[in-house]
Amino acid sequence: RQRQMCIRDSMRTAGILMPITSLPSPYGVGTLGQCARDFIQFLHRAGQTYWQILPICPTGYGDSPYQAFSAFAGQPLLISPDELIKDGLLYGDDLRDYPHFNPDHIYYGDVIPAKLRILHRSYEIFKESADLCMLKEFDVFCEHEKDWLDDYALFMAGKDAHGGACWLEWEDDLRDPDEEIKAVWCERLADSIEYYKYIQFIFFRQWNAIRDYAHVNGIKIVGDIPIFVALDSADVWANRDLFQLEKDGYPTVVAGVPPDYFSATGQLWGNPLYDWDYHKKTHYDWWMRRIKGQLNMVDYIRVDHFRGFEQYYAIP
């Protein structure tokens, strides 16, 4: 029996790369609902073992999963309205005026406001009628994830309060806050902060359900970690010592690559580079937490690009 198990474990396996956003859905973008379960069933019937996805962090204004507002948070656009209805966190009538989208393309400019309207409505229902069990679940989530969630929620609430501007354009006290100043802003933006925590609570609730469904059907999920983070992110705003930045917060150098096989003119990514000496002093704590968080969500991870740990370019 042991020999049979070894043979089975060493057999070749296959999988498919499919971004969750690309799954067919009536909501203009793929979700963590029935369309994800249908795809898992397809993989199971096809004898596949792996579902590889792109990063599922909240995207910035370029809609790229490799330029996210957080390396730890989940993408709100993936939340399924149908699952919200099942949980009593949305009503069917709330979708009556939801736009009809072309199923062949994703028009983020139209999808984002429509989806955010639904999510804000769900938050209102949660505040008005969530039962004690769900409220307790929410509190437990916030406590368990506070290591990144508190800064992320304040960061996003701060962006809303400043018309979506990059944190480098905020007033000095919130751009460079100490703990006392953070407490003042947390009180000032309390409802907006709780909204962003609620959205993450719902995202991870739905994500965990999809991950468990995949496991029941013999499918393992391969996640994706971009090696660099966006300048306009909670990660940089709240952890400036981790990056090569000037005193005013702007990068001293940024990421990119010279001309190569993929690009005749090279690529200027613009991400701030890590201060690896500082990471070493902290025993790479931030990276350890980042990888641990991802492995709590998926079975395997791909780092894009892994070679960046050994060699990278710095562009002034």
Region annotations inferred by a language model:
Residues Q2-I7:
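Short, small-residue-biased leader/transition segments that mark boundaries at the very start
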Residues Y196, Q200-V229:
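Conserved, well-ordered alpha-helix/loop/beta-strand core segments that scaffold catalytic motifs
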Residues A14-M18, W51-Q52, I221-G223, I301:
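Hydrophobic faces of well-ordered beta-strands that scaffold small-molecule active sites
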Residues R8-T21, R37:
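N-terminal regions that are enriched for targeting/export leaders
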Residues L43, I53, F155, A214, ...:
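Conserved, mostly hydrophobic/aromatic
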